[in-house]
Regions:
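N-terminal active-site beta-alpha-beta segment that forms phosphate/nucleotide-binding
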Residues: 1-56
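Short, basic, glycine/proline-bearing loop/turn elements
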Residues: 35-37, 67-71
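Surface-exposed, charge/polar-rich loops and edge strands
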Residues: 46, 51, 56-61, 69-73, ...
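Short polar/charged helix/loop
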Residues: 78
Length: 136
């Protein structure tokens, strides 16, 4: 639904495609028809979809996770794909969509873990990064 609305409103949409162990790239899609089953059966852009450039300051990256804390630390799915991809591109906007039950008091973090700047739940917007405090 988010993807379809973004495409309908004229946004450029890039989605991840797994390229090997702990490696992924983002590729532009023009419609949901550009998606095919990929790694672990998750839909990803087909091989015909052009590769997107590295994220920049105005890029919004929606990061998945099992649980999050209010400092932006997330428990992912164990592959480190997003942490590896975003290494060196921390200036982009990193957000997560979650249910309020996914917000934990504290999530243990490793030095290589990339934090999210904000979390949107069905109940609130949690601003985790000092750079976005004025949004509240």
């Amino acid at each position: 639904m988010i993807i379809e609305e973004a495409l309908r409103s004229g946004k450029r949409v890039a989605l991840p495609r797994v390229r090997g162990k702990r490696r992924m790239e983002f590729c532009f899609i023009k419609s949901p028809a550009d998606l095919k089953p990929g790694f672990m059966g998750i839909k990803e852009p087909g091989p015909w979809c052009p590769k997107a450039p590295a994220p920049f300051k105005e890029s919004l990256v929606l990061m998945p996770g099992i649980a999050f804390d209010r400092n932006g630390t997330r428990a992912g799915y164990g592959g480190g794909y997003y942490d590896t991809y975003l290494e060196g591109h921390a200036e982009c906007i990193k957000a997560a969509l979650a249910y309020s039950v996914q917000i934990a008091p504290e999530i243990p973090a490793a030095p290589a873990d990339i934090k999210v700047d904000m979390i949107v739940t069905e109940k609130e917007l949690i601003i985790c990064s000092q750079d976005f405090r004025e949004i509240r």
